[in-house]
Amino acid sequence: MGGFKIPNYEGVDPTGSWYSVLTPLLFLERAGKYFKDKTAVVYRDSRYTYSTFYDNVMVQASALMRRGFSREDKLSFISRNRPEFLESFFGVPYAGGVLVPINFRLSPKEMAYIINHSDSKFVVVDEPYLNSLLEVKDQIKAEIILLEDPDNPSASETARKEVRMTYRELVKGGSRDPLPIPAKEEYSMITLYYTSGTTGLPKGVMHHHRGAFLNAMAEVLEHQMDLNSVYLWTLPMFHAASWGFSWATVAVGATNVCLDKVDYPLIYRLVEKERVTHMCAAPTVYVNLADYMKRNNLKFSNRVHMLVAGAAPAPATLKAMQEIGGYMCHVYGLTETYGPHSICEWRREWDSLPLEEQAKLKARQGIPYVSFEMDVFDANGKPVPWDGKTIGEVVMRGHNVALGYYKNPEKTAESFRDGWFHSGDAAVVHPDGYIEIVDRFKDLINTGGEKVSSILVEKTLMEIPGVKAVAVYGTPDEKWGEVVTARIELQEGVKLTEEEVIKFCKERLAHFECPKIVEFGPIPMTATGKMQKYVLRNEAKAKANKEKS
């Protein structure tokens, strides 16, 4: 693959000891052997070691194999952040198959589409989400396995009547005997993640064993994880390849603290009790966590390494995190790159800068993780100059780029071409080589011949005290083509007027970048928390057409 060829040196065994298939299953082999007594998982009031974790994976894998699950078979998993879900990142590939994590916030119709499109043989569903599947049971080809709800045993008993098998019954047929690693080809699939589909049907992103292995190693290196690390699962395991941490934690024998709901008092208690060192989340989670802790005069007793992605952290968020004992690290990536592909590598000399300047630097998507590649290309496929002004498209390649889209050769050819994955993100490259995304190409606003970055305007609006979330987009205008429009979601109890917002922007932005229209209200989101700007644009177009008629 990719031109790899074993050299024909005299006396060298071409099947020798110097080569092994790169797969994250090697991490579990090591952890199960050398970290037997180390705590692997904490979940509610229970905790267990890597010895037990290894045994559970063997039981899950062998139980599936005894049910006829074999090489390249798919298993969908719909669940909160539970230990059984974490174990499936190893158990399913140990059985030779492919794990298909599914967002439990999706509609029943969307769940059915993914289960069927992925050709899943089984679907394990956490009891709270069973009813969603039952609505489309007749459309699903896979066999449903119920993962019982520890919170509600009586409800699970009732739900049991709706399925042929429970997870507990499945694993009763398994064995703790060690299984050999089945992966013989590094580029065979290990997981199949579906994109959130902001504008259409979700696409199945094919991740391979080699990519999962090397992505995890990069996470460990970039975020300085080791045997003493404790990772809090604030990030859903179904989201963007779980950012690689389902494998990275096991690679170093770290402890996984499973959080099955976003509960800010609980997050604080777990960080303190378990001495959490790392966590991942979107900016809104950190904003709400800081708000809770500040209202209750709380601080973390140890520094927590907080990965943030999805949007650059605002200065107010950075300040709030510093005040409660958190350190924010901005990363960037997509499902197609197993989550993070680049990091805003922080330089010590930046610590002395004013917070506003630090925030501007940290807002950048930065440079690629070690051993990955990233660039910004113009329309002719050439790198843009490092001037911080010329806009191009972010392209990526490396070990952690997906194989393509499952059963979708047209979309694969569209995005994976000329040796690069084309992200669709518009960006500039600063003189120091750090990349900064200015927008999605489809979200750039063309007003009076000027191109306006919706992200730039959103960053500015997020500086207004009391603003919870912002979506900036273009609405049709006969004179200007489009005008800059902002939908603002306010924190509870906060009052703000359109005039105040526009005045704030005029003091900080060019006149053509300032919103001409400001609306207040909820922002439509996908099930994975991505803003659906196309919904707002469609509403604006419908309104404009109605006014014309």
From Swiss-Prot:
GO terms for biological process: fatty acid metabolic process. It is an enzyme of class 6 (ligase). It catalyses: 4-hydroxybutanoate + ATP + CoA = 4-hydroxybutanoyl-CoA + AMP + diphosphate; acetate + ATP + CoA = acetyl-CoA + AMP + diphosphate; propanoate + ATP + CoA = propanoyl-CoA + AMP + diphosphate; a medium-chain fatty acid + ATP + CoA = a medium-chain fatty acyl-CoA + AMP + diphosphate. CoA binds at residues 448-450, 506, 514-516. GO terms for molecular function: acetate-CoA ligase activity; ATP binding; medium-chain fatty acid-CoA ligase activity; propionate-CoA ligase activity. Keywords: ATP-binding, Fatty acid metabolism, Ligase, Lipid metabolism, Magnesium, Nucleotide-binding. ATP binds at residues 195-203, 336-341, 425, 440, 530. This is 4-hydroxybutyrate--CoA ligase 2. Its cofactor is Mg(2+); Mn(2+). InterPro entries: AMP-bd_C, AMP-bd_C_sf, AMP-binding_CS, AMP-dep_synth/lig_dom, ANL_N_sf. The keyword Transferase does not apply. Belongs to the ATP-dependent AMP-binding enzyme family. The keyword Glycoprotein does not apply. Catalyzes the ligation of coenzyme A (CoA) to 4-hydroxybutyrate (4HB). It can also use butyrate, valerate, propionate, acetate and 3-hydroxybutyrate (3HB) as substrates. It comes from the Archaea. The lineage of its organism: Archaea, Thermoproteota, Thermoprotei, Sulfolobales, Sulfolobaceae. Its EC number is 6.2.1.40, 6.2.1.1, 6.2.1.2, 6.2.1.17.
